[in-house]
Design a protein with these regions (language model features):
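Alpha/beta-hydrolase-fold serine-hydrolase catalytic core, especially in secreted/extracellular enzymes
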Residues: 99, 105, 109-258
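Alpha/beta-hydrolase fold nucleophile elbow
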Residues: 29, 34-46
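Alpha-helical scaffolding within the catalytic cores
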Residues: 50, 88-101, 132-134
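Glycine-rich nucleophile elbow surrounding the catalytic serine of serine-hydrolase chemistry
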Residues: 44-56
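Cap/lid segment of the alpha/beta-hydrolase catalytic domain
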Residues: 1-26, 30-31, 71-86
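Conserved hydrolase catalytic core segment
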Residues: 57-64
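A short, hydrophobic beta-strand element of the alpha/beta-hydrolase
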Residues: 66-68
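Short beta-alpha connecting loops at secondary-structure transitions
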Residues: 7-11, 84-93, 114-121, 148-153
C-alpha cells in the first residue's frame, strides 16, 4: 500500500499503471502470428478482476470481459479496507460501479461472484451494479450479453468459476455454444519459473520498481515548475495553484457539508 501511495503526488495511480499494462498486453498479443488478433478476452480475480473491469471498459479489443471476485459497488468500499490498486480516486463524483460495467456494452460481460466473499465483492452488492449495467445492455439491444454467475465459494478463481468463463469465452470469441459452462479437462500446472518473463536474477539492468517510476515522474514534473519572475507572475501562479489545491483537498478546505 505504501508503494502504491508513492504515485499519488505525481497524479498517477497504481491501478492506472496496471490497466495500461493490460492494454499493452493486447498490443503484444496482436503482434503475434499465432494469436487470432480479432478475438481477445480478458479475465482475472480480485485485483485482477478490477483490472479486467477497467481494461474491459477502456479497451474494446476485448470481446469478452470476465471479472471474478471483484465486482461489488463503490459505496461498499467505504466500510472496509481495500487495496489501493483497486481504488479509482474520485469515482463516486461521476459514477457508481454499474457505469463502468456499462462501458463494456454491447460486448460480452460475465461477472462472477463468490457467496462467501467480503462485503465489497459480495453477491448482494454486485447485484446492485449488475442491475444498472443491464439497463445499458438493453439499450444496445443485447441483454443476453451480460450475465451474473454466483458460485458457492470463498474468494477464489476455482474450477466452477473457470468452467463458467470457458463457456462464455467460447460463445463470444468462437461463436460456439450458448455460454453454458464447459467442463475443464484434467491438467497439471507448470512450474512457476517457466512463467517468468525473465529468469531469476536476469532482469534487464534498466528495470524500474513503482517507487523508482514515481521518482522519475516527480523529477520530470518538478523540472517544469517555474519560480515567479515578478509579483504579477506570482499572482497568476497563485490563482492556478489555489485552484488545483482546492480541486484535490476540497472546495471548503476541511469543512463538511451536512
Amino acid at each position: 500500500e505504501m508503494t502504491a501511495a508513492t504515485l499519488y503526488a505525481t497524479g498517477r495511480t497504481l491501478a492506472g499503471i496496471q490497466i495500461y499494462e493490460n492494454m499493452r498486453c493486447a498490443d503484444y498479443l496482436q503482434s503475434r502470428s499465432d494469436v487470432d488478433s480479432g478475438n481477445l478476452a480478458i479475465t482475472g480475480t480480485s485485483g485482477g478482476g478490477n483490472q479486467t473491469m477497467y481494461a474491459g471498459a477502456l479497451e474494446d479489443r476485448f470481446k469478452a470481459v470476465i471479472p471474478v471476485c471483484s465486482v461489488g459497488n463503490y459505496q461498499a468500499y467505504l466500510g472496509v479496507a481495500c487495496c489501493m490498486c483497486e481504488l479509482l480516486p474520485g469515482a463516486l463524483s461521476f459514477t457508481e460501479e454499474w457505469g463502468v460495467l456499462g462501458l463494456v456494452a454491447p460486448r460480452g460481460l460475465m461477472v462472477i461472484n463468490a457467496t462467501q466473499d467480503g462485503i465489497q465483492f459480495s453477491v448482494a452488492e454486485a447485484k446492485k451494479s449488475l442491475a444498472g449495467a443491464q439497463v445499458v445492455f438493453r439499450q444496445f439491444g443485447k441483454p443476453e450479453n451480460i450475465k451474473h454467475v454466483v458460485v458457492e465459494s470463498k474468494h477464489d478463481y476455482n474450477q466452477p468459476m473457470r468452467e463458467a468463463m470457458y463457456g462464455w469465452v467460447t460463445l463470444h470469441l468462437k461463436g460456439e455454444g450458448d455460454g453454458s459452462p464447459i467442463t475443464e479437462p484434467p491438467m497439471e500446472t507448470v512450474d512457476r519459473d517457466l512463467l517468468r518473463c525473465f529468469r531469476q536474477g536476469d532482469r534487464p539492468a534498466g528495470f524500474q520498481t513503482v517507487p523508482m517510476l514515481a521518482k522519475r515522474f516527480a523529477t520530470q514534473m518538478v523540472r517544469k515548475q517555474l519560480k515567479p519572475l515578478h509579483k504579477e507572475h506570482w499572482e497568476a501562479q497563485r490563482v492556478a495553484k489555489l485552484g488545483m489545491i482546492r480541486r484535490y483537498v476540497g472546495k471548503h478546505s476541511g469543512r463538511v457539508e451536512l
